[in-house]
Amino acid sequence: MNGLETGKVTYALNYLNGEVKFDGENALVIGGGITGAEVAVELAKEGKKVTIIEVMDQFLALPSAVIPAYQMAVEQAGVKVITGHRLDYVDHDQAIIVDRFGNKKELKSDGGIVISAGFMPQLELQEKLEEETDIEVYTVGDAKKVRQIIDATHEGYAVARMI
């Protein structure tokens, strides 16, 4: 994604932790998973016109019993959802999205862009601690492998019972 430095762009966790507030009216959320839905609803509560951009052909395409509740919350908040598109680049208060055929669309993003496009495992700390100490280290949840929250919950419970 080019041009992120020219726009008002942040990551979902920074926004949800209250580290970032946006002026402007039109906000974009990049990523249509559960976190993206939560961010979109919060932005809508701030009075913004929110659009979710999802690269997959279906919004909230996850096997989970909570999906209908998230879909309803997004719908009730008046959030627009565009599927089958990805963010191509940002140019100040404009975002260019593109579909799989290369067709581009320009969207206003004066109210900020929140990237909620998933997480990556982070094993560096575990590896460093194992190399430098005698402490037994257990890594769980998305820090180990990105999955659904139910997997992380079970894994955390299992490790807690072991120690």
Please give the residue ranges for each predicted region.
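Conserved N-terminal Rossmann-fold NAD(P) cofactor-binding segment
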Residues: 67-70, 93-94
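Helical element adjacent to the flavin cofactor pocket in flavoenzyme catalytic cores
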Residues: 70-78
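Rossmann-like dinucleotide/flavin-binding elements
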Residues: 5, 13-65, 101-112, 116-163
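Positively charged, proline/Ser/Thr-rich regional signature most characteristic
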Residues: 1-7
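General small-molecule cofactor/ligand-binding pocket signal
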Residues: 10, 80-82, 138
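A conserved short coil-to-beta-strand element within the FAD-binding core of flavoproteins
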Residues: 83-95, 120
